[in-house]
């Protein structure tokens, strides 16, 4: 059985880049590295994931009229247990610029 080589690109989206509401330190520096991996053409498939939320997502602080990173109590419907939820800044809202794959990343039509 032959092996398939896959490159998985996880959540390289505008809202996670420098200046975004959920900026990840060093994420911008990954763009040229990923572009080089894509350019090498040594992968049988490229998978790119995107984090997408509705504008009123339960994890957004704005949904609860709270400050980002404040905490609220929520009920887990499956277990019936109360849990603490840390509220996040509004990010990666479906079909917005922030949820799009970062501009500098090479895009291929055949991403999975």
What would you call each of these model-derived segments?
Residues 8-9, 13, 49:
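Generic enzyme active-site microenvironment
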Residues 32-112:
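Active-site alpha/beta core segments
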């Amino acid at each position: 059985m032959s092996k398939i080589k896959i490159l998985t690109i996880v959540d390289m989206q505008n809202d996670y880049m420098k200046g975004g509401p959920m900026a990840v330190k060093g994420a911008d520096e990954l763009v040229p590295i990923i572009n080089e991996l894509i350019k090498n053409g040594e992968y049988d498939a490229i998978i790119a994931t995107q984090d997408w939320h509705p504008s009123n997502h339960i994890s957004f602080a704005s949904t609860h009229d709270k400050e980002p990173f404040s905490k609220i109590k929520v009920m887990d419907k499956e277990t019936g247990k109360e849990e603490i939820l840390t509220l996040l800044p509004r990010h990666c809202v479906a079909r917005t610029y922030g949820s799009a794959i970062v501009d500098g990343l090479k895009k291929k039509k055949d991403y999975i």
